[in-house]
């Protein structure tokens, strides 16, 4: 069962820290208090809070490898979790490291590593706030160009009605066939 690998990984991490951790699963998170937007929320599969480390674990069921490094979905989940903390008077988080992990069991069928992760410092994570805020606010501009592409359109709910994607498809098909005279 695919979920067995995910559970084994989580249990392994819990044992690594002698059980001194908190696990939360299927949690709705939003970075709104840090990014200034309330439309960037999502469901974090698993949060693991261990001494000094916040780990975001995302389960993927596909065969296409997903990288943990530089993964905006995981970064937004991490910012969402951090946004949910009520900071003490000294304003520090209980974490100094953010670990972002992808568990993708089906990759083992392709002899690929099914668990990948990356770690960054809390400061590096917090430095990403401005980039996310700027990118999100840029989408509010009614003149913002639609920029179709394989990565950004893959799971977009507007894919079927996007005029820019349709135009790109027409142009691509036009290049494949010679002009008939």
Where are these regions (language model features)?
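Accessory terminal regions of nucleic-acid processing enzymes
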Residues: 123-181
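Internal, well-ordered alpha/beta segment that forms a basic, Gly-enriched binding/recognition surface
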Residues: 81, 108, 120-124
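Short, conserved secondary-structure transition motifs
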Residues: 103-114
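Activation of the activation-loop gatekeeper triad in protein kinase-fold domains
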Residues: 59-60
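Metal-dependent nuclease catalytic cores that hydrolyze phosphodiester bonds in DNA/RNA
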Residues: 1-54, 97-99, 111
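A general alpha-helical scaffold signature found inside nucleotide-binding enzyme cores
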Residues: 41, 72-76, 127
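Short beta-alpha connecting loops at secondary-structure transitions
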Residues: 113-121
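Metal-dependent nuclease catalytic cores in nucleic-acid-processing enzymes
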Residues: 50, 65-102
């Amino acid at each position: 069962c695919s979920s067995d690998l995910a559970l084994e990984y989580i249990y392994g991490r819990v044992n690594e820290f002698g059980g001194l951790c908190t696990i939360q699963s299927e949690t709705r998170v939003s970075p709104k208090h840090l990014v200034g937007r309330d439309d960037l929320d999502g469901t974090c599969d698993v949060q693991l809070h261990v001494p000094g480390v916040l780990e975001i674990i995302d389960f993927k069921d596909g065969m296409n490898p997903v990288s943990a490094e530089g993964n905006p979905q995981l970064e937004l989940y991490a910012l969402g979790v951090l946004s949910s903390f009520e900071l003490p008077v000294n304003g520090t988080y209980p974490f100094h490291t953010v670990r972002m992990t992808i568990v993708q069991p089906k990759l083992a069928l392709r002899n690929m590593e099914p668990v990948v992760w990356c770690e960054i410092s809390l400061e590096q994570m917090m430095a990403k706030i401005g980039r996310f805020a700027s990118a999100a606010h840029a989408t509010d501009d009614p003149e913002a160009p639609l920029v179709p592409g394989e990565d950004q359109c893959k799971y977009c709910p507007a894919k079927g009605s996007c005029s820019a994607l349709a135009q790109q498809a027409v142009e691509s098909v036009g290049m494949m066939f010679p002009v008939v005279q």
